[in-house]
Regions:
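Short, low-complexity N-terminal intrinsically disordered segments enriched in polar/charged residues
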Residues: 26-67
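A beta-strand edge to alpha-helix "cap/lid" segment located at domain peripheries
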Residues: 28-34, 97-178
Length: 178
């Protein structure tokens, strides 16, 4: 059987193009799943700003809402989801009563890149500020599970879920193994 040189070159060219496309596509996916040092810092700042916003109710809840993507959502301890900035600002207003009475300590932040942005987990301890004879005390805690997206305004929460430590699910073991 005689095979023409042109047919061999054509077949090899098709195979090379297919391999090049596969390598390029997988390289782009791997590159998309990377975060820069600046990304890590910005995401940590987002979480720190969240603690201040939720504790103080800054700007009538609007600072809290601005930390979420326009279609972002927060899921509370019961799994109820509040979605969209207007609803999130209203949630922050409802949950802030008078002078600051609690402080969120958000610690042990783990951030992992994804093809869409990043995910994160961190622990929460809530300190209740004492009044009169009542001393300060830790009155709650749990952990957050976050989905972050990069927007034109910087990193924002796409979704944030609070899971209480009392009887709630534990953080997944996958995150601890990384």
């Amino acid at each position: 059987m005689i095979v023409s040189y042109a047919r061999v070159v054509s077949t090899v060219s098709v195979i090379c193009v297919a391999l090049l496309w596969t390598v390029t596509a997988s390289g782009q996916a791997a590159q998309a799943a990377r975060l820069t040092p600046a990304d890590y810092i910005e995401i940590r700042q987002l979480v720190a700003r969240y603690a201040y916003a939720v504790d103080t109710g800054a700007d009538n809840g609007n600072v809290y809402a601005s930390l979420f993507a326009p279609d972002g959502a927060f899921a509370d301890r019961m799994g109820r989801e509040t979605k969209g900035r207007d609803a999130l600002a209203a949630l922050a207003r409802r949950n802030t009563r008078g002078p600051q009475s609690a402080i969120h300590f958000i610690v042990n932040h783990v951030i992992e890149p994804t093809s869409e942005g990043a995910v994160g987990k961190e622990y929460l301890l809530q300190l209740r500020i004492g009044e009169g004879e009542r001393p300060n005390d830790i009155f709650g805690g749990g952990h957050y599970e976050d989905v972050y997206v990069k927007t034109p305004d910087g990193w924002r929460f796409k979704r944030r879920q609070f899971i209480p430590s009392e009887g709630g699910p534990r953080p997944s073991r996958d995150a601890a193994a990384r």
